[in-house]
UniProtKB/Swiss-Prot annotation:
<keyword id="KW-0240">DNA-directed RNA polymerase</keyword>
<keyword id="KW-0548">Nucleotidyltransferase</keyword>
<dbReference type="GO" id="GO:0003677">
    <property type="term" value="F:DNA binding"/>
</dbReference>
<keyword id="KW-0808">Transferase</keyword>
<keyword id="KW-0804">Transcription</keyword>
<dbReference type="InterPro" id="IPR036161">
    <property type="entry name" value="RPB6/omega-like_sf"/>
</dbReference>
<comment type="subunit">
    <text>The RNAP catalytic core consists of 2 alpha, 1 beta, 1 beta' and 1 omega subunit. When a sigma factor is associated with the core the holoenzyme is formed, which can initiate transcription.</text>
</comment>
<dbReference type="GO" id="GO:0006351">
    <property type="term" value="P:DNA-templated transcription"/>
</dbReference>
<dbReference type="Pfam" id="PF01192">
    <property type="entry name" value="RNA_pol_Rpb6"/>
</dbReference>
<comment type="function">
    <text>Promotes RNA polymerase assembly. Latches the N- and C-terminal regions of the beta' subunit thereby facilitating its interaction with the beta and alpha subunits.</text>
</comment>
<comment type="similarity">
    <text>Belongs to the RNA polymerase subunit omega family.</text>
</comment>
<dbReference type="InterPro" id="IPR006110">
    <property type="entry name" value="Pol_omega/Rpo6/RPB6"/>
</dbReference>
<protein>
    <recommendedName>
        <fullName>DNA-directed RNA polymerase subunit omega</fullName>
        <ecNumber>2.7.7.6</ecNumber>
    </recommendedName>
</protein>
<dbReference type="InterPro" id="IPR003716">
    <property type="entry name" value="DNA-dir_RNA_pol_omega"/>
</dbReference>
<dbReference type="GO" id="GO:0003899">
    <property type="term" value="F:DNA-directed RNA polymerase activity"/>
</dbReference>
<dbReference type="GO" id="GO:0000428">
    <property type="term" value="C:DNA-directed RNA polymerase complex"/>
</dbReference>
């Protein structure tokens, strides 16, 4: 039996501990989600990949924002370096 997931998986509280603010977390996750979307567009078109694909395992029905948040939760991304940009 599959474990029930909440509305936000991973929980937002655990993600906030990795970011200095809610605003920073939202901006960073949204940027990463757009990169993931663009990766799949490039993959479909057969063009050169300008973006890195998902760094975590992905199910077919996962949205790019969910994938981005899971990457943050699993420490696959460094939020500190993006704050300087």
């Amino acid at each position: 039996m599959e474990e029930d997931r909440g509305i936000a998986d991973p929980p937002l509280d655990s993600l906030l501990s990795r970011s200095g603010s809610k605003y920073g977390l939202v901006i960073y996750a949204a940027k990463r989600a757009r990169q993931i979307d663009q990766y799949y567009i490039d993959l479909h078109e057969g063009s050169f990949y300008a973006h890195v694909g998902p760094l975590v395992s992905v199910d077919a029905d996962d949205k790019s924002l969910t994938v981005a948040m899971r990457e943050i939760a699993e420490d696959k991304l460094d939020l500190k370096s993006s704050a300087a940009e």
